[in-house]
Amino acid sequence: MKKDRKNIILQSLASMLEDRNLSKITTALLAEKSGITEAALYRHFPSKRSIYAELFSFCDDAIFAKCNELKKNKMSAKDKTKNAFVFFMMFVEKNKGFARLLSREALSTNEQNVSDNVNQFYERFELILRQILKEDAENLTTQPGISAQLIVTAIEGNISRYIRSK
């Protein structure tokens, strides 16, 4: 039951993040959306920051699990990179609330550690792309590091554009 409530809270937050008109998500609003009291919310999470951190952790786990799966695959580096990019964009499209989290738009200064985690997430994603691209470096027109930077920049740009278009 405790795990179920935690998941309900996380799903409620993800759903609330999809609403661009909701400028600030308070614990009172989150508790109401989750169908629990604010006190019950704090029994599951010590702070609002920890709720955001756990939601981000879900996103992080999903994307890096796919990246690690792709790294082990026997397909070409080009196909691995393409699949990582497509998976990332489809994940954000399917989980619209994560777009605001990954763009840091939904985070306030109180969630600075989550914002730092997002920065580290992009750095790790870029590192994985660089490692994949090094497998086929001789067939690239640019260095693997530059290609990885361009892909991550394109992802961040697409997420920003996606948010603006909502």
Q: Regions from the language model: what does each represent?
A:
Residues 8, 16-50, 54:
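Helix-turn-helix
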Residues 61-64, 68, 112-138, 145-149:
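Amphipathic alpha-helical packing segments from all-alpha helical-bundle domains
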Residues 90-127:
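Short secondary-structure transition hinges
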Residues 99-104, 119, 134-166:
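Hydrophobic/aromatic-rich alpha-helical bundle segments in the mid-to-C-terminal region
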